[in-house]
Every structure is written in C-alpha cells, then in structure tokens.
Regions:
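C-terminal "cap" of GNAT-fold acetyltransferases
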Residues: 46-82, 192-222
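Non-catalytic interaction/regulatory modules that flank or connect domains
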Residues: 91-189
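Conserved active-site tyrosine of GNAT-family acetyltransferases
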Residues: 29-31, 176
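Conserved catalytic-core motifs of GNAT/GCN5-like acyltransferases
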Residues: 17-19, 37-58, 182-194
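Conserved GNAT acetyl-CoA-binding A-motif
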Residues: 8-22, 153-163
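Short, cationic low-complexity segments
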Residues: 81-112, 212-242
Length: 242
C-alpha cells in the first residue's frame, strides 16, 4: 500500500483508496500514517465465515469495512449535489481532505429520460453493486427491477454509487431512501466523472453494528452517523411497508 501511494504521487493521481477491516484498528492506523482520511463505512460487506488468524474479534456475523482516501495529487474543484441531511458529514470529509467542493442540496429532477448504469451481484459474498453513470427519469423504476433480482439471488448488501456531479444526485438519493438505502460513503474522484455518493441497503436486521472498531475519534463519529442513518432509514422503510 505504501509503494502504491508513492507511485500515485509520482504520476499525479488525485488519490488512493483503502478499505480496512473493523474487527481491529491495526490496518487503519497504518493508513493514517500515510495521511488517509475516513470517508465511509460499508456495513456487513465481509462474509461472516472470514476470519483473521491470530486476531481476536468480538464482531458477530458479517463484518464491516471502513473506507479511507488519501490525497496524493492535485484535486480540482467540483460542484456536487447531495441531500441536505448528508451535508454536515460530507463537508467534514472534504474539509479534512482539504479539497474544494461546492455543495448543493437542491433536489433537481433528471433532465434526461434514460439512465445508464452497470450492475453486478455475487451469490457467494451476497453483495450486489450498482454503479450509475447517468441519472435519468427512469432510474428508480429500473433499479427496483434490478434490486428484486438481487434479492432473489440471496444478496444481503446492495450498494448504489451515484455520480455526485450530476445535479439530480440529491433527488436520486432521496428517492432511494424510500427503498431503504442510506449513506455509506462519500468518495472523491472515485469515477472518471468525479465524486461518488455511495448508498447502501443491508436487509438483515441482525447485523452487528455494536462492535465496529475505529482507530480514532473522527472515524468513530463517522461510524456513528452511518449506523444511525442505517437504523433510521431501515426502520422508516419497514414501517412504511406495514
């Protein structure tokens, strides 16, 4: 990872990403020494059958991963669109990274009819990923169909990556919250078109979120926000379906 960081600096790559386990803080501390900043948390991404030799863990069931970003080169200014209730946490992330972002919360509807996205799912890991390139009027209807297929495949964790530079991103995130998607991460320069707002839906309510270890107070604050958002959105979705 350190070698990758040095290579990224030499070639002017904006930054590098790392996903660290949360059953202990060792890998997180190593990343902190390289200048990495916590940008998100993916709940229950690691199968509960995965264990680390010689490392005890109090986590029960599937394990979560902490997402970190390390700025290694020039990061240009961008205008992004996110829901208002994500505003404080995203502002904190970009301030800690010392990058320039103009943040809008206005829920602009899409200006195009047809969405563009790619989707993948694994029956082994029980994780599904959807990466949206273009937000169109048909996005939610098409995602509902895709997510139904994921559920039939036994997927527990579904992630949707939205292009934050799309003015309709805040609208799409609000619509996806109705489908039980909550904030997972804010990922600067993650796609060729810029920043990504990652949302997640974990359908197994037995997920252990009480033993997620973070290496410093900033990570703990981000973890607490993400866990509380997951609880709030999931509870809201369950109540609305009754």
């Amino acid at each position: 990872a350190e070698f990758r960081n040095e290579v990224a600096k030499k070639i002017g790559t904006p930054g590098t990403y790392a996903n660290c386990v949360t059953n202990h803080v060792g890998s997180q501390v190593t990343a902190f020494r390289r200048g990495a900043v916590e940008v998100g948390l993916v709940l229950g991404e690691v199968n509960d059958g995965v264990s680390m030799t010689g490392l005890a863990t109090t986590t029960k069931g599937r394990k979560s991963l902490l997402s970190l970003y390390n700025v290694t080169g020039p990061v240009g200014h961008r205008a992004v669109s996110i829901p208002e209730h994500h505003g404080d946490v995203v502002r904190t992330i970009v301030e800690r990274l010392d990058i320039s972002r103009e943040i809008s919360h206005h829920p602009h509807r899409p200006t195009v009819a047809v969405s563009s996205f790619s989707s993948s799912a694994s029956a082994v890991s029980k994780v599904g990923e959807i990466r949206v390139e273009t937000i169109g009027e048909d996005l939610i209807a098409r995602l509902v169909e895709d997510l139904e297929t994921q559920v039939l495949a036994g997927v527990l964790l579904s992630m949707v990556d939205l292009p934050a530079s799309d003015p309709a991103c805040a609208w799409a995130a609000a619509e996806l919250e109705r489908l039980a998607f909550s904030f997972s991460a804010y990922l600067p320069e993650f796609s060729p078109d810029g920043d990504v707002l990652r949302l997640q839906r974990f359908t197994d309510l037995s997920l252990d979120v009480d033993h997620i270890a973070c290496g410093r107070a900033e990570g703990e604050a981000l973890r607490d926000f993400i866990v509380e958002e997951w609880r709030r959105v999931t509870r809201k979705a369950v109540l609305s379906s009754e």
